[in-house]
C-alpha cells in the first residue's frame, strides 16, 4: 500500500508483509514537480522486491511530467536528445521519443515544465512555450509525421504563442506561415494526450484556473486571460474558425488551443 500523503515514499505496514506469494502491478502517475511515474514505481518495487514480492511496473501518465518515459517504456520506443530553449529562453537539454512505428512522443513539460524553474522564478508573464516548437521541428526534420503530445505540468500561460513563434522562425523563413503550415506541417497529425477540459479563456480558462500555481498574481491572471482572448480573436479572423472554447484548449497554459487552432490537433482525454 503506497503512502502518498506527503510524497514521502513509505509503504504502509499493513497488508503487504504476508503477501509474498502475490505479484503486484504498480501503475502510478507522477508526483508533480517531485518524481516521475517510473521513479515512483522503482521506489515501491525496490521495497517490495526486498521482501521477496514480485512486481510489474506499468508507468502511467495524464500527459504531464513523466509522460515521455512512460510512453516510450510502454511502446519500446527510444529517446532522442535535443538542445532547445527552456521557458526562460535559456539553452537546455531535452528529449522527445520515437516509437518503433516512427511516431514522435513529445512531452511539453520537457521544454516548459514547472520542474525546470525554481518556485521563486515562476512568472507566466515571461515564461514561453518556444521550446515546444523546437521539439516539434526537430522531430519533423528527423522524418516524424505522426505525433502524440503530452499536455500538462507547464509553467507557461502564453496560449502557445511561443510555440507558434518557434515554428515560424524555423519553417517560415522566406515565406508566410500559411504556406509553411501546408508545406512543412501539412503532412503531420497531432494527437493531444490530456486530462483537463478547460477552455482557453474565461473563469474556467487557462489563466484563471492554473495561473496562480504558476506564480501569477490576480493582476497577472487578468492580463494573461486578456492576452489569450486577443490571440484567439485574431486567430479566428485569420482562419475563419475558433477552437478556443473547445474542451482542453486551456490545457498546458493554452498550448491545447494552439495545437488545435494552428495544427489541427485532435484532443484525447485519459491516462
Regions found by a protein language model. Name each.
Residues 22-151, 155-271:
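N-terminal loops that bind phosphate or other acidic moieties
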Residues 5, 20-21:
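N-terminal regions of proteins, emphasizing targeting and processing segments when present
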Amino acid at each position: 500500500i503506497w503512502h502518498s500523503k506527503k510524497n514521502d515514499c513509505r509503504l504502509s505496514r499493513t497488508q503487504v508483509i504476508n503477501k509474498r506469494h502475490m505479484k503486484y502491478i504498480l501503475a502510478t502517475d507522477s508526483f508533480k514537480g517531485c518524481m516521475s511515474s517510473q521513479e515512483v514505481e522503482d521506489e515501491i518495487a525496490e521495497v517490495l522486491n526486498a521482501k521477496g514480492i514480485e512486481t510489474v511496473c506499468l508507468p502511467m501518465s495524464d500527459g504531464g511530467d513523466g509522460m515521455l518515459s512512460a510512453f516510450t517504456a510502454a511502446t519500446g520506443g527510444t529517446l532522442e536528445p535535443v538542445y532547445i530553449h527552456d521557458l526562460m529562453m535559456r539553452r537546455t537539454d531535452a528529449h522527445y521519443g520515437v516509437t518503433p512505428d516512427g511516431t514522435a512522443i513529445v512531452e511539453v513539460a520537457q521544454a516548459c515544465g514547472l520542474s525546470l524553474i525554481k518556485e521563486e522564478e515562476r512568472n507566466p508573464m515571461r515564461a514561453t512555450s518556444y521550446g515546444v516548437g523546437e521539439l516539434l521541428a526537430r522531430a519533423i526534420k528527423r522524418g516524424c509525421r505522426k505525433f502524440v503530445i503530452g499536455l500538462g505540468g507547464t509553467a507557461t500561460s502564453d496560449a502557445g504563442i511561443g510555440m507558434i513563434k518557434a515554428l515560424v522562425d524555423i519553417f517560415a523563413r522566406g515565406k508566410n506561415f500559411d504556406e509553411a503550415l501546408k508545406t512543412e506541417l501539412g503532412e503531420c497529425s497531432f494527437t493531444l494526450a490530456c486530462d483537463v477540459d478547460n477552455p482557453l479563456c474565461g473563469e474556467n480558462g487557462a489563466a484563471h484556473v492554473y495561473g496562480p500555481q504558476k506564480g501569477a498574481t490576480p493582476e497577472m491572471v487578468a492580463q494573461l486571460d486578456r492576452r489569450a482572448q486577443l490571440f484567439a480573436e485574431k486567430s479566428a479572423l485569420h482562419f475563419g474558425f475558433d477552437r478556443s472554447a473547445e474542451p482542453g484548449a486551456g490545457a498546458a497554459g493554452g498550448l491545447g488551443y494552439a495545437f488545435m487552432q494552428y495544427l489541427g490537433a485532435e484532443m484525447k482525454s485519459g491516462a
